[in-house]
Amino acid sequence: MSASPLLDNQCDHLPTKMVDLTMVDKADELDRRVSDAFLEREASRGRRITQISTECSAGLACKRLADGRFPEISAGGKVAVLSAYIYIGKEILGRILESKPWARATVSGLVAIDLAPFCMDFSEAQLIQALFLLSGKRCAPIDLSHFVAISISKTAGFRTLPMPLYENGTMKCVTGFTITLEGAVPFDMVAYGRNLMLKGSAGSFPTIDLLYDYRPFFDQCSDSGRIGFFPEDVPKPKVAVIGAGISGLVVANELLHAGVDDVTIYEASDRVGGKLWSHAFRDAPSVVAEMGAMRFPPAAFCLFFFLERYGLSSMRPFPNPGTVDTYLVYQGVQYMWKAGQLPPKLFHRVYNGWRAFLKDGFYERDIVLASPVAITQALKSGDIRWAHDSWQIWLNRFGRESFSSGIERIFLGTHPPGGETWSFPHDWDLFKLMGIGSGGFGPVFESGFIEILRLVINGYEENQRMCPEGISELPRRIASEVVNGVSVSQRICHVQVRAIQKEKTKIKIRLKSGISELYDKVVVTSGLANIQLRHCLTCDTNIFQAPVNQAVDNSHMTGSSKLFLMTERKFWLDHILPSCVLMDGIAKAVYCLDYEPQDPNGKGLVLISYTWEDDSHKLLAVPDKKERLCLLRDAISRSFPAFAQHLFPACADYDQNVIQHDWLTDENAGGAFKLNRRGEDFYSEELFFQALDTANDTGVYLAGCSCSFTGGWVEGANRTPCNAVCAIIHNCGGILAKGNPLEHSWKRYNYRTRN
């Protein structure tokens, strides 16, 4: 049905002034003012409106929609004119306002969309995603800072896009209209103002699986120095902490600050810090090899809280691929990727496709799945409901996918992000080599798709940093802090715990020496393998519920190997060589690290092998570090001899200046970190919420990064201790600070969905 000729004609004779709403900064007021502007514009049409009213009385119906699309003039239920919004930057708006008459040509080619700038169920990032899918044009937030409200004829071409915009739990569709001058499709510019859709905040934000931000709680408790306390008439518990990694140290420290006097930490190894392990070289103590955690994203807000608290917040960028000159070796051919530039042409399809996916999401059949950027934006802006519902859709549709099958489904389907279908196995192998920002992800392709996607949404793949002092300085400073006259380190017993058992109302700890001790509460921060095999905690349901036991026993622990080499000089600077190398051989990822940037003549440090899973398992067959280094050097030499010729230890000292570690064979670890396989995200849920399950509190609590949704990241090792400490204080009659995780109303997900 064509639009009313009167409406078409009236749009050709535009009024001389739009309503200026740029000073309006409240969504509800903008809603009212925009609606009033449409009403006033219709009233000004005089004779034409009179005649339209006559048509209405003859069978046309006029109505205002609740979401701000006003007015609609319809016949037989088919809309003739409705409202829409063109989103533009301040500069484009200025050009329009300076033109007389209104410069319709300025907005030609743009897309008007039926989402109002006062819509609080839609974020700016979602708007960017929708406009790209409707127009094929990319926008930055600065390009969408303002809007022009228009009345547009239904004769304009339109496209409807199903997107996860929720109102009372229902899916809504977004409609876009292409603004063109051809065909004289009528539209009328009515008002202009600022886009008030939700924008990201500059502060911390919750992770997608928790939707609770621990950082504000820690900040709030900084004033009092404690997250809870015990009234004078309440007896304090006797507590054992198993493991002196970062989780165990945080637990002990927070309990001591809360007034718990009797705290004992049991550590099986001869050092503290666990996987926060910085090896200092004897001849250059300021050069440190990070044997465990080494990349620290600013989005790890709790980690940075503790770094700031202990004076370690000075960080430097980690030399990830593409952020520094990077040498790529694929099938024996060498490619140079200059810092800050696009990768070599061979890699463009996978590079552009992945980045398009991050911004644009995935269009599959009947729905657009929210882009990772849009979900992150929702978390930043506090739109928790939308973030939750969008993530649940990803869980529903991709929860049973491996990272490999998920990538195949997205990039080999009919709507591949970036517009180019990937080829198999060529693009597959290129993507495995290049990765998603922090190096090749090929070895973890069989991990769950959701497991990798959550890292992206949580911001852990962005702006990763390195700690100049070595990250083990953090657990060292926590351990050296004196609380109530005694340091945390003085409470550490370096002995292995062989069993943890219930004994009436107490918990019995049996040590390797045969000695047993009774405690009121126990926090276990050991690796999952030790919880099962050494502590024997999953043999029955006396301590943990069956689903928790299952999660401990079956969660996948990733194998990882590192080999560091300290060189006589920073040869990559001397000879202008790339400081990052990615290869498809046994030496997967090589990083050159400078811990003494102020000294050009200082020692160099090369992480010559950082491998995961199968690539790590292969290296276990070569346990001798000198032999392993020779194998890696020879492999690099075949493609990059100019680099390999410098890979010899300073002073030819293989004993002191080469260090390696295999986390899978570490008897106190049993793997580097937890990485869920497809369909196993409910294991993380069971492990994380165990300490918060007050209905099944047995006095034993789990903590540690492997008991979080972010295995392998220090952030999880800082949040789970908070859960355990809160549980102990609460269960023993203490008083917790407001806003604690125990009193939070958790918005849980269904992780056991079927595709």
From Swiss-Prot:
Q: In which pathway does it act?
A: Plant hormone metabolism; auxin biosynthesis
> EC top class, in one word?
oxidoreductase
GO MF terms on file? Answer: tryptophan 2-monooxygenase activity
Q: Required co-factor?
A: FMN
Catalytic activity line of the entry: L-tryptophan + O2 = indole-3-acetamide + CO2 + H2O
Q: Which GO terms describe its biological process?
A: auxin biosynthetic process
Q: Quote the SUPFAM superfamilies the UniProt record gives.
A: FAD-linked reductases, C-terminal domain (SSF54373), FAD/NAD(P)-binding domain (SSF51905)
- List ligand-binding residues for FMN: 247, 267, 275, 295
Instruction: Name the Enzyme Commission number(s) assigned to this protein.
Output: 1.13.12.3
Tell me which UniProt keywords the record has, alphabetically.
Auxin biosynthesis, Crown gall tumor, Flavoprotein, FMN, Monooxygenase, Oxidoreductase, Plasmid
Q: Does the keyword Zinc-finger apply?
A: no
Any note on cofactor binding? Binds 1 FMN per subunit.
Which Pfam families has this protein been placed in? Amino_oxidase, RolB_RolC
- The entry marks the following residues as binding substrate, namely 295
Protein family membership: Belongs to the tryptophan 2-monooxygenase family.
What this protein is called in its record is Tryptophan 2-monooxygenase
Q: Which organism is it from?
A: Agrobacterium tumefaciens (strain Ach5)
